[in-house]
């Protein structure tokens, strides 16, 4: 007959102490290595005094850094306004998305319906029954603001204007455009068709960053189709050699609107002005915003995608340490000559235990400029840590028990 003995902590203590003696030394290592502080490339300079942002003759405006997403100036940024042909930024974005995913190609021949041909307002001048390449229609949408081209692509991608508008709204929600609702792909007036300066800046940032190989189209100054040459309506392209996008808009209700972007050195800004009095005014007001941003701010690259920002202790895995970093390059926009005030604080989840997948969120990073929080990012596992073998897991369990006990006793 087998006799079982009851568990006794006193009997187990020598075993546990023996295990502890084997693993105590490794436990003296830190839970994680200190995080590297931001090392901006800019050299220290005397601090620049930052004036208040310019006041514009417009209903709403916003100035955003395309790299960091930081807002540098704004006025009524969330007011719901008619966007006019700024709507076509979403139309073009969805075409670019379909191209990027391989669902369509630039050479696809799009049949032109009578509905597309009859659409009023600005035109590319396509004809009923023509078959026009996607590449030509995309140019027609972006450069000459063709309503006919916009409807043709809506029909090609979604089967009609209404289902395409539904897709537009789904993507607006996905991108965080909280004050936007689209009814058509053109921007022709409708009471329930609206957007905001903030939402349009956010959309433009995605156009620039998500599909960069298509972005050069926004800087082209003219477009010819069917023997008809038309200029790009964005006159800022002629005024500022650093400007390279994006889109104009006008209706009587919307006024004269412009979403523009310019890049100087490594800094790219996006300016949105809505509700100005003339085509000249929208250019001048946009220039004021861009000049303010480039004069008084700078965008610094703090960390590279995939750079190891922290090495953290992992329990019960096939390795004892986990490399931690960020998913994308980290940019921060700060007032000029204050880069030395940047600090980063990493908060790694305590008690990381295998298995851990590459790309799994394991903590967060907070970037401060002095006492101001200027950015937050998720911290991800840069590698996979698989579950360790039986004895490795048992040793780590004992090790962790004593580590927690030691921390509880001695803080």
List the predicted regions and their residue ranges.
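Generic alpha-helix initiation/capping and coil-helix boundary signal
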Residues: 11-14, 165, 244, 279
């Amino acid at each position: 007959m087998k006799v079982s003995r009851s568990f006794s902590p006193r009997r187990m203590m020598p075993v546990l102490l023996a295990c502890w003696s084997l693993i105590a030394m490794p436990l003296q290592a830190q839970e994680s290595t200190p995080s590297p502080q931001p090392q901006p490339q800019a050299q220290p300079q005397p601090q620049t005094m930052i004036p208040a942002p310019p006041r514009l003759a417009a209903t709403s405006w916003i100035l955003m850094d395309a790299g960091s997403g930081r807002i540098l100036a704004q006025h009524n940024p969330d007011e719901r306004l008619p966007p006019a042909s700024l709507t076509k930024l979403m139309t073009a974005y969805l075409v670019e998305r379909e191209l990027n995913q391989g669902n369509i190609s630039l050479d696809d021949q799009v049949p032109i319906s009578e509905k597309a041909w009859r659409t009023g307002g600005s035109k590319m001048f396509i004809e009923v029954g023509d078959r026009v390449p996607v590449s030509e229609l995309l140019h027609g949408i972006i450069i000459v603001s063709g309503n006919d081209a916009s409807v043709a692509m809506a029909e090609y991608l979604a089967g009609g204007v209404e289902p395409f508008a539904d897709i537009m709204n789904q993507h607006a929600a996905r991108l965080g455009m909280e004050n936007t609702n689209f009814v058509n792909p053109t921007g022709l007036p409708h009471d329930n068709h609206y957007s905001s300066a903030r939402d349009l800046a956010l959309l433009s940032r995605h156009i620039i960053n998500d599909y960069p190989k298509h972005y050069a189209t926004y800087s082209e100054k003219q477009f010819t189709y069917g023997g008809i040459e038309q200029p790009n309506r964005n006159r800022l392209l002629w005024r500022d050699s650093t400007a390279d996008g994006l889109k104009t808009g006008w209706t009587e209700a919307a006024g004269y609107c412009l979403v523009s972007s310019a890049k100087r050195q490594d800094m790219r800004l996006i300016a949105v002005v809505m509700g100005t009095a003339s085509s000249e005014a929208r250019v001048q007001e946009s220039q004021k915003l861009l000049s303010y941003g480039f004069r008084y701010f700078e965008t610094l690259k703090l960390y590279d995608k995939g750079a190891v920002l922290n090495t953290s202790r992992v329990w019960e895995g096939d390795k004892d340490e986990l490399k931690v970093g960020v998913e994308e390059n980290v940019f921060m926009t700060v007032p000029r000559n204050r880069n030395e005030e940047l600090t980063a604080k990493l908060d790694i989840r305590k008690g990381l235990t295998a298995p851990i997948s590459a790309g799994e969120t394991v903590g967060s990073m907070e970037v401060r400029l002095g006492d101001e929080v200027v950015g937050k990012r998720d911290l991800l596992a840069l590698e996979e840590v698989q579950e360790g073998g039986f004895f490795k897991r048992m040793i780590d369990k004992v090790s962790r028990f004593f580590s927690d006990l030691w921390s509880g006793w001695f803080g």
